[in-house]
């Protein structure tokens, strides 16, 4: 059985098409029954449906793939809360040791083979043309950074991911080492781990992917097909109790506070001015009354003084009159005595 290098490269380096839809199985009932009978391999069918038409005989070779019987394959049972019904073939461990990789590489050497692994990767990328219109899920922007110079895999192993709501941040550049994890960002949450010996496919449910997308705000990952999730992220129109005030509304508020606080000050000042004015008026009235009373007393005293002065004058005249009278009487008495 021969496998073209272009097909294997498309599976390794291209956007990974094996996404699980938690709303329903990827296979119909006829395909599931054929899987149970062991007469048809869904892996070969899915691989052939996603293989690029690179050369003329590549599709025929890929359609003629026959994997080992299902009784020889190592099947791992899913956990109790498996959300992928009908996807048991994804947990099967496929052994590729029986494939003659040298002959596969030699089958693609009919054309001018690239001289370096980078040229080979560029050739494989240029020949890939996937038809994603037939997929059950909506088209999403898939990005898989290419920075690995690894040999062809000898073993394909798929494991279900434990329910951990975390998505690794998108790597800047994948270093060239023996084991590198390359995350694939799409709604089904498939993460690939490439190594020289095997390929590990890790699947997460869509609900956990949405939760991880909510928690991982720094990575900038967003899910387009979740209206409920988008409605939760919409900002509430109700103002928060400790939110910062709007800068446009703050000047009006400040002016309002200023006028409301200035009005009592002006009223208090006016009230104080009126109090001072009334106090001054009362003081002037009091002083006027006191002055008038003093003037009246002075006038009365002056009147009494005039009366007393007049009495004194009259008394002084009477006294003078009496003196004169006494003098005349003495003189008259002396005249009589002399006679």
Swiss-Prot record:
Q: Where is the composition biased (Basic and acidic residues)?
A: 231-247, 300-313
- Enumerate composition-biased segments (Pro residues): 162-173
- The UniProt annotation puts the region (Basic motif) at 268-288
**Does the UniProt entry include the keyword Nucleotide-binding?**
no
Q: Where is the bZIP domain?
A: 266-329
Record's keyword annotation contains Transcription: yes
Annotated membrane-spanning segments are none
User: Which keywords accompany this UniProt record?
Assistant: Activator, Biological rhythms, DNA-binding, Nucleus, Repressor, Transcription, Transcription regulation
Name the chain's protein: Cyclic AMP-dependent transcription factor ATF-4
Species of provenance: Danio rerio
The uppermost taxa in this organism's lineage are: Eukaryota, Metazoa, Chordata, Craniata, Vertebrata
């Amino acid at each position: 059985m021969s496998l073209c290098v272009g097909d294997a490269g498309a599976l390794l380096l291209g956007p990974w098409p094996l996404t699980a839809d938690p709303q329903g199985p990827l296979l119909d009932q006829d395909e599931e029954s054929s899987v149970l009978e062991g007469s048809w391999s869904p892996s070969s069918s899915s691989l052939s449906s996603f293989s690029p038409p690179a050369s003329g005989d590549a599709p025929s070779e890929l359609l003629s793939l026959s994997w080992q019987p299902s009784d020889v394959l190592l099947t791992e049972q899913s956990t109790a809360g498996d959300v992928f019904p009908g996807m048991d073939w994804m947990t099967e461990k496929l052994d590729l040791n029986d494939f003659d990789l040298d002959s596969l590489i030699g089958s693609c050497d009919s054309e001018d083979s690239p001289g370096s692994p980078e040229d080979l990767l560029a050739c494989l990328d240029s020949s890939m043309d996937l038809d994603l219109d037939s997929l059950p899920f909506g088209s999403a922007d898939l990005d898989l950074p290419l920075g690995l110079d690894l040999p062809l895999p000898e073993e394909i192993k798929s494991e279900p991911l434990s329910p951990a709501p975390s998505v690794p941040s998108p790597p800047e550049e994948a270093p060239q080492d023996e084991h590198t994890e390359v995350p694939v960002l799409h709604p089904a949450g498939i993460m690939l781990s490439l190594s020289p010996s095997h390929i590990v496919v890790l699947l997460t449910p869509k609900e956990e992917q949405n939760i991880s997308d909510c928690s991982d705000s720094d990575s900038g990952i967003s899910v387009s097909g979740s209206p409920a999730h988008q409605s939760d992220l919409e900002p509430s129109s109700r103002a928060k109790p400790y939110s910062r005030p709007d800068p446009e509304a703050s000047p009006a508020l400040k002016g309002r506070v200023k006028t409301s606080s200035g009005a009592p000050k002006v009223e208090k000042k006016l009230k104080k001015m009126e109090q001072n004015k009334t106090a001054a008026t009362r003081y002037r009235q009091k002083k006027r009354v006191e002055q008038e009373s003093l003037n009246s007393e002075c006038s009365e005293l002056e009147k009494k003084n005039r009366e007393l002065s007049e009495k004194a004058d009259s008394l002084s005249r009477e006294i003078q009159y009496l003196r004169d009278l006494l003098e005349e009487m003495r003189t008259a008495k002396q005249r009589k005595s002399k006679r």
